[in-house]
């Protein structure tokens, strides 16, 4: 299926593979699976958004994203679940296994279920080892989130990562340069996740042309001469917004570009 909103095209397709039972189409819009022993649902989605530094493209390509979606599904449709899982695990562990953390010679296997550990920490009933394990788990959970939401060729992790459940998410799922985006990316180099830093680097580069324009409009010299450098403020997004989002003082934060380039 495809959806187009103001030149933005969103395409998505599903492939449903059943073992036993049958699949039927209902009302031309729904798939009905009956009496199956198991089903595997493969989903691919894409848009015509292109992150670039050339305003003439207006961030949209002329390509139909449905073709990319179909090509992706064609590559995996005949693969077994075990093969897909193995590919995923190999890809994930190539990053996750770059470092290990062990606080006090703890076993790598869970010492207790996570919900039990969280409850125990809240109620102060955990042992020292259980709390250490939970802290270690929480540390690695942060790495998991970044590995899952910031990969080469993608956009950087925003306020909700890739887990926004709505078409319009809180704070527009954008980027806040006064602390949030830094909190997402501070761990990349210290925890050996350099490849996950690349989307952030490319995103910063894409802001430069609009940032130069904003700097000229807001901070031009008294004699009207050109300013040097570029700027972005409290909020920015994938559409190149670098101006203050509102008139309030917190939004007038010209140090955003400096923060991101540290």
Kindly give the residue locations of the regions a language model identified:
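Beta-strand-rich recognition/accessory modules
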Residues: 17-82
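Short, small-residue-biased leader/transition segments that mark boundaries at the very start
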Residues: 2-5
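Active-site-adjacent "gating/activation" loops or surface patches in catalytic cores
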Residues: 213-261
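Extended, hydrophobic/aromatic-rich amphipathic alpha-helical segments that build helical scaffolds
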Residues: 43, 135-149, 257-262
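Structural helix-adjacent loops and short alpha-helical linkers that scaffold large soluble proteins
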Residues: 79-83, 104-105, 125-135, 146, ...
